Amino acid sequence: MTDYQNEVLEFERIMKEHTNYMRNSINLIASENITSSDVTEAVASDLAHRYAEGQSHERLYEGCQYIDEIEDRVIDLSKKLFNVDYANVQPISGVTANLAAFFGYSDYGDKLMALDVPYGGHISHAKVSAAGIAGLKTISHPFDKDIMNIDIDAMNKKILEEKPKIVLFGGSLFLFPHPVKEAREAADEVGAKIMYDAAHVLGLIAGGQFQQPIAEGADLMMGSTHKSFPGPQGGIILSHKENKEVIDNAVFPGVVSNHHLHHLAGLGIASAEMLEFGQDYAKQIVKNSKALAQSLYERGFDVLCEELGFTESHQLAINVSNIRSASDIAHDLANNDVILNKNLLPGDNVDDSDNPSGLRIGTQEITRRGLKEKEMDEVAEFIKRVAVDKENIKDEVREFMDQYTTVHYSFSQNEGYRFHKL
C-alpha cells in the first residue's frame, strides 16, 4: 500500500470516528440537524459531480434534462410547503441567500436595519459579512432585552427617521417571533423592503409552529435548509412572483454559479418529508425547547425569559455568568459528549466574542432522534452535572443516546449516524 492509499484509509477512519462521536453525543448545536437516509443517498449521488448553470430549462450546459426535472419538483414542493408563489432554490447557503437579496434590492451605501450580534443578529447582517460585501450601512434595531425582542414603537420611529432601504428581521439567537406586520406601514412610508432571515426557524415556519413572515408582510424570506429544517446544507429564497426576475438574476449570475445539485435533490426529499411530517416535528421541537428550559430553570440556571415561557422556537438561552465561564462550560460539556455553543447575550462585548456570558441550546436534532419532553429532564440533569458539579458523565451520555439512533419524522425511519461506504 502506498502512502497516498494510506491517506485515503486515514480519511475513512476519521470520518467513521466523527460519525460515531455524533451518534453517541447529545448534540444541542442550534444550527445543525441530521438528514434522513433518503436525503443522504441523494447527497451521495452522481449529481454531486454535475453543473447546471442558469435557470431550469435555460441552462448554459447541455445534459441537464433530469436536473431540470429535479429543480422543477423542488421549486413546486417549496412553494407548496411555504404557501408562496415564488421560490429560488439555488443559493448554496443562508448567507448566499442573504447576499443575493441584498444585491437585488439595494445599492452601495444604502441602509440596512437589523439586529446587532449580541442581540441575536447574524454576522451576515453586519459589516464584516454579507451586508458589508453588499456595501450596506448597517443600523441597529432597537431592542428590549427583557423580552428578547425588538422594541416595536422605537423600531417604527427609527425606520421613519433613518429611512433604510431594507428592514431585516431574523437572527441567530431567535427565541420569539419578530414584529414583521408591525413594521409594514413604516416600511411602506419610506419605501423599504422587509426581509426575513429564516435560517434558524425555517423548519418551524414550514411546520406551522412559528410566525408566517410572507403572510405577515415580508417581501422576501431567506433561509438555510439544514437547521430546524432537516435538509442538506443549502439556502433558499421565498417571495412573491413579482420578485422573480430580480432575485433570479441576483442569484445567478450574481452570487452562484453551480448550485450543488446533489443538495438540490436532497432539499426536495426533505421538503416532501416536511410536507408529510413537518407539523408534528415542529410542534415537538417547541415542546422540547420549553421542557428543557423549564428543567434547567428548576435546577437553578438563569434561563432567559422565564416570564414569557422561555421560548417559542427550537432555541433557548442561558446566562451562566453566575456559574463560571461560558467558554469553559461549553468546552467541558463537549468533553462529555454534550455539544452546544457559547453565545453572546445582550450587554456582551461583541469585540470579546470568545468570552460571552451565554450558552445557546437547540433541540431540533435530538427531537429528530425521538427524544420528547420526559427526556429533556435527563438532558438538563446531564448539563447541570457538568456545568455546576464538574462531573465526568461521558459514559452515561453514550449509554443514554444509544437508545435514540433512529431518524424520526422521515419515510425511511432508519438508523442515523451510519458511515455510508459505497
From Swiss-Prot:
Reactions it catalyzes: 5,10-methylenetetrahydromethanopterin + glycine + H2O = 5,6,7,8-tetrahydromethanopterin + L-serine
Pathway: Amino-acid biosynthesis; glycine biosynthesis; glycine from L-serine: step 1/1
UniProt keyword terms in alphabetical order: Amino-acid biosynthesis, Cytoplasm, One-carbon metabolism, Pyridoxal phosphate, Transferase
Marked site: Plays an important role in substrate specificity: 226
Top-level taxon: Archaea
InterPro entries noted in UniProt: PyrdxlP-dep_Trfase (IPR015424), PyrdxlP-dep_Trfase_major (IPR015421), PyrdxlP-dep_Trfase_small (IPR015422), Ser_HO-MeTrfase (IPR001085), Ser_HO-MeTrfase-like (IPR049943), Ser_HO-MeTrfase_PLP_BS (IPR019798), SHMT-like_dom (IPR039429)
Keyword Transferase: yes
Locations listed in the record: Cytoplasm
Residues that bind (6S)-5,6,7,8-tetrahydrofolate: 121-123, 245
Alphabetical GO biological process terms: glycine biosynthetic process from serine; tetrahydrofolate interconversion
One Gene Ontology term of the molecular function aspect: glycine hydroxymethyltransferase activity
EC number(s) per entry: 2.1.2.-
Cofactor(s) this protein cannot do without: pyridoxal 5'-phosphate
Residues modified to N6-(pyridoxal phosphate)lysine: 227
Predominant localisation class: cytoplasm
GO cellular component: cytoplasm
Quaternary structure (record): Homodimer.
PANTHER family xref list: SERINE HYDROXYMETHYLTRANSFERASE, SERINE HYDROXYMETHYLTRANSFERASE 1
Family as reported in the entry's similarity comment: Belongs to the SHMT family.
Role summary: Catalyzes the reversible interconversion of serine and glycine with tetrahydromethanopterin (H4MPT) serving as the one-carbon carrier. Also exhibits a pteridine-independent aldolase activity toward beta-hydroxyamino acids, producing glycine and aldehydes, via a retro-aldol mechanism.
Name of the featured protein: Serine hydroxymethyltransferase
